Swiss-Prot record:
Keywords: Cell inner membrane, Cell membrane, Membrane, NAD, Quinone, Translocase, Transport. It is found in: Cell inner membrane. NDH-1 shuttles electrons from NADH, via FMN and iron-sulfur (Fe-S) centers, to quinones in the respiratory chain. The immediate electron acceptor for the enzyme in this species is believed to be a menaquinone. Couples the redox reaction to proton translocation (for every two electrons transferred, four hydrogen ions are translocated across the cytoplasmic membrane), and thus conserves the redox energy in a proton gradient. Coiled coil: none annotated. The gene is nuoD2. The keyword Membrane applies. NDH-1 is composed of 14 different subunits. Subunits NuoB, C, D, E, F, and G constitute the peripheral sector of the complex. GO terms for cellular component: plasma membrane. It holds the Pfam family Complex1_49kDa. This is NADH-quinone oxidoreductase subunit D 2. The keyword Cell inner membrane applies. Its EC number is 7.1.1.-.
Length: 399
């Protein structure tokens, strides 16, 4: 028999030795399209991901957006500057304090308002409390996406303490409308600082336990380690920020690298993975960054409580303008939200009390654009882990 005898166009007999004959057939495979969402628990909102697959391997991933589009930027052209704050609340509804913080900094920059020092500390305290609450949702829901139920219960148990604190100062558990242009809606209640310090002391060991639950659970590590790799250069070129960028080993945090408010006075470390428990740039790295950031936020809250000026006659509305009508001009201000850089570009024509243009720079939208890069070549089951590691909020993506 010849060494290679062609029987059909796709079937061959190959003699590899005196006794061995191997039948080979080239299988013709077809790509299949798998739709994840828009009603899918792992997408954490109305997101549809179209997966082009070869068997169980993803060849291409395409995110379809717009299911939660509410015309925020167009509405902002017909609402006065203070009235936009409730709209901003509803973008990333898990981190409303940070949304309001960034927006109010932009308007105050446009107006040239100087904020009282106590208010600056109050804003940072509530923003960092909200950051911890947001990260607890991210970590807890991510764990349950991958089948780990216990961390989910731990995270939401401790998040209740934070929501109770935030409810105490503004009456709402979500969509706070607490940070105003030029100030805040209310001063802290009596003994609020003491309650915050009690929470910090209680939660420090809980945060360490949460970190161990993530790094010492073999199944969780196997589902996230070396999955959805995002190289640092790709993340930088795409404009990624927050835990997405820091998870790829890039030490970039606006609170340190483009500081605002009183962040330059605070001592904290930029959270990046060390590469021991995870592979730099994978799903596990991004989630470890969030766990580490919780510790750093606790440090900042402690410092703010110690450094904040005490004034029994403090007026939280002292710098709040009665009428916001800025001169013609434009401004861009940004802040470090839990999911990355949240910026507002505002144009005033100087003619009225509404902005000519209010553009929001969404960290979630930019980070989600990297999904095709991370999902390519991965299994369908791992796409769940990848989407969860991005930690998107569709209210901010679609706006």
């Amino acid at each position: 028999m010849a060494d290679d005898v062609q029987l059909e166009s796709s079937v061959r007999f190959t003699q590899t030795g005196p006794q061995t004959i191997v039948l080979e057939k080239d299988l013709d495979t077809e790509y299949m399209i798998v739709n994840m969402g828009p009603q899918h628990p792992s997408t954490h909102g109305v997101l549809r991901v179209e997966l082009l697959t070869d068997g169980e391997v993803v060849v291409k991933a395409t995110a379809h957006l717009g299911y939660l589009h509410r015309c925020f930027e167009k509405h902002a052209e017909y609402v006065d500057y203070p009235g936009i704050v409730p709209y901003v609340d509803r973008m990333d509804y898990l981190a409303s304090m940070n949304n309001d913080f960034a927006y109010c900094v932009a308007v105050e920059k446009l107006l040239g308002i100087e904020i009282p020092r106590r208010i600056e500390f109050m804003r940072v305290i509530v923003a960092e409390l909200n950051r911890i609450a947001s990260h607890l949702v991210a970590i807890g829901t991510y764990a349950i996406d991958l089948g780990a139920f216990t961390p989910f219960l731990f995270c939401f148990r401790d998040r209740e303490h934070l929501l109770n604190l935030l409810e105490w100062i503004c009456g709402a558990r979500m969509l706070y409308n607490y940070i105003w242009v030029g100030g805040v809606s209310h001063d802290f209640p009596a003994k609020f600082e003491e309650r915050v310090m009690e929470f910090v002391r209680y939660f420090k060991p809980q945060a360490r336990e949460l970190y161990q639950l993530l790094t010492e659970n073999e199944i969780f590590v196997q589902r996230t380690k070396d999955i959805g790799l995002l190289p640092a250069d790709v993340a930088i070129n795409a404009g990624a920020s927050g835990p997405m960028l820091r998870g790829s080993g890039v030490k970039w945090d606006l609170r340190r690298d483009d500081p605002y408010s009183i962040y330059p006075e605070l001592e904290f470390d930029v959270a990046v993975p060390d590469g021991k428990a995870s592979v730099i740039g994978d799903c596990l790295s991004r989630h470890l960054v969030r766990a580490i950031e919780i510790d750093e936020s606790l440090k900042m809250i402690e410092q703010c409580i110690d450094m904040m000026p005490k004034d029994p006659n403090f007026d939280p509305h002292a710098a709040v303008p009665k009428r916001v009508k800025p001169k013609a001009g434009e401004v861009y201000a940004r802040g470090e939200a839990p999911r990355g850089e949240l910026g507002f570009y505002i144009i005033s024509d100087g003619k009225g009390t509404t902005p000519f243009r209010c553009k929001a720079r969404s960290s979630c939208f930019v980070n989600l654009s990297l999904l095709p890069e991370m999902a390519k070549g991965q299994y369908i089951a791992d796409v769940v882990a990848i989407i969860g590691s991005v930690d998107i909020v569709l209210g901010e993506v679609d706006r």
